[in-house]
Design a protein with these regions (language model features):
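Primarily recognizes the serine-hydrolase "nucleophile elbow" in alpha/beta-hydrolase
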Residues: 73-77, 81-125
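Catalytic histidine neighborhood in serine/cysteine hydrolases
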Residues: 168-189
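Post-His helix in hydrolase/transferase enzymes
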Residues: 191-205
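Short beta-strand/loop motif that positions the catalytic acidic residue
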Residues: 146-148, 153-159
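Acidic catalytic loop of the alpha/beta-hydrolase fold
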Residues: 157-162, 188-190
């Protein structure tokens, strides 16, 4: 898998694994990566099979395996799960939620998350039998109850791709400790402004 690893201090700082969304590539996330560089944190950003220069065809099972491989790669570098933060963006929230279940990660961040792929598809194609036709389910609403790690859910209230109510519902279903950031004017690709960065920094500090 193609990925970028930015190391600051493996001993004293937590490490983020960033799971990106469906659209674009690693290069499209440079604006987020640059903000991570200003924070006392290590980070690994990976591209899925079938994305960027990676070979293969993306599937729910395949992306879970890619996520697991990323965690194992960090484990081999001596980074334990309790020092890893899973950060999922859009589609990547399905992978982060799945992997965080019944595990002891330092924290979980979900940006523009969906309740399930079926719900997300019904929002776009309300008159089709999506639950029958859709192969990949990504049932975040069922899995989030199994997450014991501290969780931060961020969702723009004007999201036109994944409706805001999905992020709000996941927040309601999540176990404590849980935190939210719901800016009123943000769309699907959230603006990495001062308020969002402060929210991330506060969350990171709460994990220490």
């Amino acid at each position: 898998l193609l990925g970028w690893f930015h190391k600051k201090d493996l001993k004293n700082f937590k490490t983020i694994i960033f799971f990106h969304g469906n659209a674009g590539s690693l290069e499209n996330r440079i604006h987020k990566i640059n903000h991570f560089k200003d924070i006392n944190i290590n980070f690994l950003i990976v591209a899925w099979r079938g994305f960027s220069e990676n070979q293969g065809k993306p599937s729910e099972k395949g992306l879970y395996e890619d996520g697991e491989s990323s965690i194992k790669w960090l484990n081999k570098k001596g980074i334990k799960n309790e020092n890893i933060i899973l950060y999922g963006e859009s589609l990547g929230t399905g992978i982060a939620t799945h992997l965080a279940q019944n595990n002891n990660f330092a924290g979980v961040i979900l940006e523009s998350p969906f309740t399930s792929m079926i719900d997300a598809a019904k929002n776009v194609y309300p008159y089709f039998p999506i639950n029958i036709l859709l192969k990949d389910k990504y049932e975040n609403d069922k899995k989030i109850r199994n997450i014991k790690s501290p969780i931060l859910i961020m969702h723009g209230e004007k999201d036109k791709i994944v409706p805001f109510w999905m992020g709000k519902k996941l927040y309601e279903l999540a176990n404590k400790p849980k935190y939210s950031y719901f800016p009123k004017n943000d769309n699907h690709m959230m603006e990495y402004n001062k308020n969002l960065i402060e929210t991330l920094n506060s969350f990171f500090k709460s994990l220490n």
